[in-house]
Structure formats: structure tokens, C-alpha cells
A protein has these predicted regions:
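Distinct, well-ordered alpha-helical segments
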Residues: 163-173, 199-200, 222-227
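Short, electropositive alpha-helical surface patch
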Residues: 136-139, 166-181
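Acidic, metal-coordinating catalytic segment for phosphate/diphosphate chemistry
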Residues: 1-79
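Acidic (Asp/Glu)-rich catalytic clusters
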Residues: 108-109, 169-177, 201-207
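An N-terminally biased module of ancient metal coordination in phosphate/nucleic-acid-related enzymes
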Residues: 65-162, 187-189, 193, 210, ...
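Short acidic, glycine/serine/threonine-rich loops at helix termini
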Residues: 3, 127-129, 165-168
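Hydrophobic/basic alpha-helical segments enriched in Actinobacteria
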Residues: 31-32, 37-38, 172-176, 188-189, ...
Length: 229
């Protein structure tokens, strides 16, 4: 069932201990009392039967959250309607699937206040990274859309963090550039100390506002690089 496949194993073990303390057990996706399966229709009822507030999957970690749930003290999570914008976005100018214009329309439909446009930098040739000229052309499109009103389009770029910690920024882009998403896209096998210093050097750049995919891990596909977070 979902509850047995979602969240950490530690959380599930803590949930089972809580059930056992009440003479119950969780097995085969059901809540049992002796040999009888209790009438529990969903997760909300399962947690309620154990005297707890429902714990969203995002909070299922080391088991300590169950204590908070028992006292109705879980934090309120951010919901889609709370979002006002996003900054790490690509368009068809690099390797995205929507144009700048389509991104602006989508942001308006979502009720966002802003949307950052941060296509890849030149070093990301595999992702059609933008040269200085192409970035300038994109910014002219952004200026035109911003002049019409609606969610503000923010001028950014996802800059590769080079092995020495420098950011791969198109020449002259500092004038007009509002923010940088700094990301590691190469040299994943550096030693932890060197990788950490590399990333620290990048985030110290005055234009850097976002550290993109900070661990480099691709779930079930690639382990993260070594660094001290």
C-alpha cells in the first residue's frame, strides 16, 4: 500500500511501534487487532486510529514527527496555491519544451507574480546553451512581454560551475542580468573537499541567487557528487 511504500523505513517502523503499544499491528496494508482487520479506509483513518494527525509523505522521516502528530503540532506545508513564482526554468531557447511567451502565459494562468527565465549557459553545448547574442535576443523578447503587464519575467541564466569554481557567463551579460542559477554539470568525480570549494566559489559570485540541483543525484540513475553540505 502507499503508506508502506512512501516515506522512510524509519517512519514506518515508528508507526508500527506505536500500533504495537496499543495492541495493534500494521501488516499487508491493513491495521489489525489480533486476527481481525479493522475498518480503516484510508491513511487519514489509520493515523487517527493510532491517535495521530495525518502525516504527509514529505514529513515521514525519522519517526519524531509522530510525536508532533500525536499533539497536533505538525507544520503547515506549502501548497501550490501559495507559490508566487519560480526561478529555475528553461525554455525552447535551450533545452526546455515551452517558449518564453508560453511560460509567461502559464505563469499568468497559475496566478504567479513572477517567473524566472534561466536557460543554459554556453558551456552546456549538449543543452543548446545560449551565447551572448542569443541571450540578448531573449532579453528583448522578455522586455516586450514585460511591457504588456502580467507576471514579471525575470532575466536569468543557469550558469555551469566550471571545475575551478568560475561561472560560465556569456560575455557582457552582467548588464541586465538579474540572477544566476549556478549548477554543476561536469567533473562529478572531484574529491569532496575540492568539490565543496568549487561550489562555494561559485555561490560567492554576486549574481548567484540559486544553487541548482545541489547534490547532482539522479534518483535511481546517478549517485550525487561528493561534497560537504
Amino acid at each position: 500500500t502507499l503508506i508502506e511504500a512512501t516515506g522512510s523505513q524509519t517512519h514506518l517502523e515508528a508507526l508500527r511501534r506505536r500500533a504495537a503499544a496499543q495492541g495493534l499491528r500494521i501488516a499487508d496494508g491493513r491495521l489489525w487487532s489480533g486476527g481481525d482487520a479493522l475498518a480503516v479506509a484510508d491513511e487519514l483513518q489509520l493515523y487517527a486510529a493510532l491517535g495521530c494527525q495525518w502525516v504527509p509523505p514529505e514529513l515521514r522521516e525519522d519517526g519524531a514527527e509522530l510525536e508532533a502528530a500525536a499533539h497536533r503540532r505538525l507544520p503547515t506545508l506549502v501548497e501550490p496555491g501559495d507559490l508566487r513564482g519560480a526561478l529555475h526554468n528553461h525554455t525552447t531557447d535551450s533545452d526546455g519544451t515551452a517558449s518564453v511567451e508560453a511560460m509567461a502565459r502559464a505563469a499568468a494562468e497559475l496566478g504567479w507574480k513572477f517567473v524566472g527565465i534561466a536557460d543554459h549557459s554556453p558551456a552546456a553545448h549538449y543543452a543548446n546553451g545560449l551565447s551572448a547574442d542569443r541571450l540578448a535576443a531573449q532579453w528583448r523578447v522578455i522586455d516586450g512581454l514585460n511591457a504588456r503587464g502580467g507576471p514579471r519575467l525575470v532575466k536569468g541564466i543557469e550558469a555551469d560551475i566550471l571545475p575551478d569554481g568560475r561561472l560560465d557567463l556569456p560575455a557582457g551579460c552582467e548588464v541586465g542580468l538579474e540572477y544566476v542559477v549556478a549548477s554543476v554539470h561536469s567533473s562529478f568525480r572531484m574529491a569532496a573537499e575540492a568539490q565543496t570549494e568549487r561550489i562555494l566559489a561559485a555561490v560567492r559570485h554576486p549574481a548567484c541567487r540559486v544553487l541548482g540541483h545541489p547534490t547532482g543525484r539522479l534518483l535511481l540513475a546517478r549517485p550525487g557528487y561528493e561534497l560537504d553540505l
